[in-house]
Amino acid sequence: MKPVVVERSTKETQIRVEARLGDGKATVDTSIPFLDHMMTALAKYSGIDLTIHARGDLRHHIIEDVALTVGPAIAKALPATAARYGDRSVPMDEALVQAVLDVGGRPYYQGPIPSSLYDHWMRSFCDAARFTLHLRVLRGEDRHHIVEAAFKA
């Protein structure tokens, strides 16, 4: 299966994403180590192979524009036979996050998670992919653990 390719080029960023159903392999280079880590986790736990290359002026611009590019790439990579709804709860040490997803074409995000940058990533991703996502932080104190559990869920 050929990967879906989505590119975004603005005054602030240049992003290229390839996505396809696969084994959850990831090749990610955004210049932001934590974002690379989250995109690798998203690929692994979704079973979607992702190749992401991103450059930009500010961390905030890169994070948002990666979301705006990964969203449609994943949406287009899903087969028409994919289940519309899904839910998963993921623990990460003291953190526990529940995600409920609808890929039916109605963009909406209900959070929050305790990081304004990555909460904004989720909202931008949902808007661009036209997905509905509800995230509930059931437990947790470490922001890294909560955000990572959210991406894995």
Where are the predicted features?
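Polyanion-binding surfaces on beta-sheet-dominated domains and ring/shell assemblies
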Residues: 1-153
